[in-house]
């Protein structure tokens, strides 16, 4: 996902809706895929999201991502008023140590993690955003889904991947 992608913004929460009916047989693993044409803003948003997750766990990570999507003007333009809101968004997601958040967002290891997510996505057939990969962890079968598809289409791919 690219946090500056307007289509990803509309797609926020859809994969989670799709897995709900599978009761523990499917899960969502978020991977960053900031597109070059959304500039440094998309990368920086990914860094902050990752760092919020390190402080506030998965729930905080997804809360930050959803709030970023709600507030961003998208297409690399970022938040109204610039990055001044990031600390408040992070705190509302449960990451209260803003100083540690700032240090984390500048950590080369975080940038490498984002680059690794992009490389993994490309290897798996992702060429743009939004993009999903439905994988059966038992068999290793992976099925890429490109674009902001409806919940039912994701459910059908999950059913196919699970052998149902």
Language model features: what each stretch is:
Residues 1, 13-17, 87-164:
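C-terminal cap of thioredoxin/glutaredoxin-like
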Residues 1-91, 124-127, 160:
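Structural alpha/beta surface segment adjacent to cysteine/selenocysteine redox centers
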């Amino acid at each position: 996902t690219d946090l500056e992608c307007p289509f990803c913004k509309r797609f926020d929460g859809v994969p989670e809706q799709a897995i709900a009916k599978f009761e523990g047989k499917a899960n969502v693993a978020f991977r960053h895929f900031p597109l070059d044409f959304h500039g440094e803003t998309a990368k920086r948003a990914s860094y902050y999201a990752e760092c919020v997750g390190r402080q506030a766990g998965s729930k905080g990570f997804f809360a930050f991502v959803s709030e970023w999507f709600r507030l961003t003007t998208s297409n690399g333009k970022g938040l109204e008023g610039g990055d001044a809101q990031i600390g408040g968004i992070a705190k509302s997601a449960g990451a209260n140590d803003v100083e540690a958040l700032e240090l984390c967002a500048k950590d080369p290891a975080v940038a490498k993690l984002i680059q690794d997510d992009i490389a993994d996505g490309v290897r798996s057939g992702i060429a743009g955003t939004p993009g999903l990969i439905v994988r059966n962890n038992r068999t290793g079968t992976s099925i890429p889904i490109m674009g902001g598809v409806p919940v039912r289409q994701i459910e059908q791919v999950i059913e196919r991947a699970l052998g149902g």
